[in-house]
A protein has these predicted regions:
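Small-molecule kinase domains that catalyze NTP-dependent phosphoryl transfer to phosphate-bearing small molecules
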Residues: 125-179
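ATP-dependent NMP and nucleoside kinases share a basic, alpha-helical "lid"
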Residues: 72-124
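ATP-dependent small-molecule kinase phosphotransfer cores
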Residues: 33-80
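The Walker A (P-loop) glycine that initiates the GxxxxGKT/S ATP-binding motif of P-loop NTPases
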Residues: 7
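Hydrophobic positions on the alpha1 helix immediately C-terminal to the Walker A/P-loop
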Residues: 16
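Short hydrophobic/aromatic beta-strand immediately N-terminal to the Walker A/P-loop
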Residues: 2-4
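Walker A (P-loop) phosphate-binding loop of P-loop NTPases
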Residues: 10
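Conserved lysine of the Walker
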Residues: 13
Length: 181
């Protein structure tokens, strides 16, 4: 199975994907490892479709955030996996995932902006100067890319506001095991 987890910053994508990876025994690919800089959300989506989900030699160039350039090539295990990050779910990434012999599911997280901001700053206080710029890219991504996703693959939407991580994981796990496995 290939599970794509998307949502705005601070919505709980990394926590969810990490815990699902443990429960489902799947490798987790984090888009934070290959976004090409702070203006690279759309390019990150393209990297998933063109490189991470390739049927032969999948992988990506790890982004060197300190030097603002592409770094080493990171091979990705072919087959089942979880990919998480803002921009993970687009029509192109879903098409690329569907080429495989694996079932595909999408999980879209949302959350109240103040809660998400607080979570993101707690995780990485150096992110603060980039919050607005990244939020604009997310806004564009969700306006353009989130329409009709449920028509392409099973898609679960979860508003994480007021939920603890365990509740989010349980909903996602139940969805995956019902619709995908």
């Amino acid at each position: 199975m290939i599970v794509l987890v998307d949502g705005p910053s601070g919505s709980g994508k990394t926590t969810l994907a990490t815990r699902l990876g443990i429960l489902l025994r799947l490798p987790v690919i984090h888009m934070d490892d290959f976004y090409p800089g702070w203006s690279g959300l759309a390019a990150g989506s393209d990297i998933i479709a063109a490189s991470v989900l390739k049927t032969t030699d999948p992988g990506y160039y790890r982004w060197d955030w300190a030097n603002d350039r592409a770094g080493e090539w990171v091979p990705v295990p072919p087959g089942a996996k979880i990919i998480e990050g803002a921009g993970a779910v687009t029509a192109e990434t879903l098409r690329a995932a569907s080429i495989s012999d694996h079932q595909v599911a999408a999980i879209m997280l949302t959350g109240e902006a103040t809660t998400r901001y607080r979570r993101a700053m707690r995780r990485d206080p150096y992110y603060e100067p980039y919050w607005e710029m990244w939020a604009e890219q997310e806004k564009h991504h969700y306006a353009v890319q989130s329409q009709g996703l449920g028509d392409l693959v099973p898609t679960l939407w979860i508003d994480t506001t007021g939920l603890d991580a365990g509740q989010v994981v349980r909903r996602a796990y139940d969805f995956i095991t019902y619709y995908v496995e």
